[in-house]
């Protein structure tokens, strides 16, 4: 099971990532863009998606792992249940959310250090 500390460690390992409170809960930003926040619901954290359509596909494919509340209905983001993902999947999810918010120079530096393994 992934813990809040695991999520924090992965988020802060990404270039330019900073932790700031959001409604008294941890959130993580790159520049001024929020890419992850620990949610007030138990066993949930919020991440961004590329689009509402992409998010909806994830929700349909794996409703046990991913969900939204009415607040996120028209927003390109979703909630993840950390108890339902392993460390590798959580790392991939958090990194992808960061990639959607990071400036090009940080993406280039990150990609140079982490070339694709496919």
Residue ranges of each PLM-predicted region?
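Charge-dense, helix-prone N-terminal extensions
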Residues: 1-118
């Amino acid at each position: 099971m992934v813990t809040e500390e695991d999520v924090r460690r992965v988020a802060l390992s990404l270039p330019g990532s900073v932790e700031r409170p959001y409604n008294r809960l941890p959130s993580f930003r790159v520049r001024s863009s929020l890419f992850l926040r620990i949610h007030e619901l138990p066993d949930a954290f919020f991440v961004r998606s590329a689009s509402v359509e992409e998010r909806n596909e994830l929700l349909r494919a794996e409703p046990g792992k991913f969900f939204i509340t009415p607040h996120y209905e028209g927003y390109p983001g979703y909630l993840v249940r950390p108890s339902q993902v392993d460390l590798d999947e959580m790392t991939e999810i958090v990194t992808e959310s960061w990639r959607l918010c990071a400036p090009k120079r940080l993406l280039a530096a990150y990609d140079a250090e982490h070339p694709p393994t496919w």
